[in-house]
A protein has these predicted regions:
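Compositionally biased terminal segments of proteins
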Residues: 1-194
Length: 194
């Protein structure tokens, strides 16, 4: 999102591609996964992690993250059949509601989560992975915090958050972080999070 929609260099290449997919039930998820594999472009990475696929030619990893009808009341999902692996789905509905269409260099258009939604998902992932994959999420979150102002622009900030410019010691990065926090709060006030 930062690079293709806003021209912000992320300084590192992502290690995988995550696709959030709203599904009615596990049968729909299984059918989607099976269709991707049957299409010949993707292969399963392991039977233990059914959400992980790999693009055959590039070996680029693809994670399919279901949400919606597979979620439990606490907005988590437990992977069948044993339900020992649990994912937190907090932020997935919000990301879908706040998505933007982005055109990639190859001419492909797809809906991508807004930066406030990406930051919300990053915080959720950081919380989930804090004991197992340290140091992976904080640099991404810092990138969003530092560059959000540049991405949304002065007009958005001045129109919706004019008070941020009242400080005598205006700091661009601090204003960017505060602006992102406010826009995340609006996103979390959406009906899906109430």
């Amino acid at each position: 999102m930062l690079l293709h929609a806003h021209g912000v260099d992320t300084l590192r290449k992502t290690q995988d591609m995550d696709f959030g997919v709203m599904v009615r039930d596990w049968g729909i998820f299984d059918a989607l996964r099976d269709a991707l594999i049957a299409g010949g472009e993707f292969e399963a990475v392991s039977n233990d992690a059914v959400h992980k696929l790999s693009h055959k030619n590039s070996q680029y990893p693809l994670d399919i993250v279901p949400f919606g009808g597979v979620e439990r009341a606490d907005r988590t999902l437990a992977w069948p059949p044993d339900e020992h692996t649990v994912f937190d789905c907090f932020g997935m509905h919000e990301a879908m509601q706040a998505s933007h269409q982005v055109r990639l260099p190859e001419g492909v258009s797809l809906n991508v989560a807004s930066i406030p939604a990406l930051a919300l998902l990053k915080i959720t992932a950081w919380h989930d992975r804090r004991l197992t994959f340290r140091g992976r999420d904080a640099p991404d979150l810092l990138l969003y915090l530092r560059h959000y102002f540049d991405c949304v622009g002065y007009d958005h900030a001045a129109t919706h958050h004019a008070d941020l410019f009242d400080a005598e010691d205006f700091d661009h990065e601090e204003t960017s972080a505060r602006l992102l926090g406010r826009d995340m709060l609006q996103l979390m006030d959406a009906p899906a999070t109430r």
